[in-house]
């Protein structure tokens, strides 16, 4: 549907063929590497280091982001506590459940207090209990920053999103009326989905 391409454009991994992506009125291409300070990314693939402990992984990611150790020492315990990983911080990542790994990926995205969080299929492969937990975490972050997440799971969007965009064949669908009806609780998001896609696949 073009979801991965759109996410790569927003994160700066791809450059648009035409048009521009703006942050506070500035082209992200002109912002250069400083743009990366504004974003935290939770990728779809859980590419973690199985022999690292959770805590070591966060310190490693903090170093890659250019954070000094003093600041990392302040942030990492807070993040581990927020994501309910303090008791597991010294366990090897290979011992983590899928939900714990996802929380750890969210933790690295939170390092250095980004103003934009980007999630790509954040609940893929999780059991229902883990999915609800991750969804609740994402909802909590939206109070003080921009949260963008791409998913095929309608229930995740229904519970966690305040704005919805539909992608089909790489194009954004003109769905302002339908999404406004959803926000006004005149219809469900599932009904909006069926209106546009029927039995086809989609990205949100």
What spans do the regions from the language model cover?
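Helix-to-loop junction immediately C-terminal to a conserved catalytic motif
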Residues: 11
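Conserved ABC transporter NBD signature motif
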Residues: 19-30, 34-35, 174-176
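Conserved ABC ATPase signature
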Residues: 51, 92-96
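Conserved ABC ATPase "signature" region
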Residues: 59, 63, 70-88
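Catalytic Walker B motif of ABC-type/P-loop ATPase nucleotide-binding domains
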Residues: 117-121
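Helical segment within the ABC ATPase nucleotide-binding domain
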Residues: 131-143
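Conserved beta-strand-loop-alpha-helix hinge in the C-terminal portion
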Residues: 171-194
């Amino acid at each position: 549907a073009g979801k991965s391409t759109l996410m790569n454009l927003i994160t700066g991994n791809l450059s648009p063929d035409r048009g521009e992506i703006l942050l506070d009125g500035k082209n992200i291409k002109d912002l250069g590497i400083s743009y990366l300070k504004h974003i935290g990314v939770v990728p779809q693939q859980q590419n973690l280091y199985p022999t690292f402990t959770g805590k070591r992984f966060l310190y490693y990611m903090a170093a890659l982001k250019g954070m000094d150790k003093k600041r990392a020492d302040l942030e990492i315990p807070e993040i581990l506590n927020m994501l309910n990983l303090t008791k597991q911080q010294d366990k090897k990542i290979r011992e983590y459940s899928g939900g714990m790994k996802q929380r750890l990926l969210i933790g690295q995205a939170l390092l250095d207090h980004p103003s934009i969080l980007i999630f790509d299929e954040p609940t893929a492969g999780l059991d229902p209990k883990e999915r609800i937990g991750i969804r609740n975490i994402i909802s909590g972050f939206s109070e003080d920053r921009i949260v963008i997440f791409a998913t095929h799971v309608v229930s995740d969007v229904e519970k966690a999103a305040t704005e919805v965009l539909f992608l089909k064949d790489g194009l954004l669908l003109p769905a302002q009326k339908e999404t406004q009806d959803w926000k006004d609780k005149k219809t469900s998001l599932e009904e909006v989905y069926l209106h546009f896609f029927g039995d086809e696949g989609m990205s949100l």
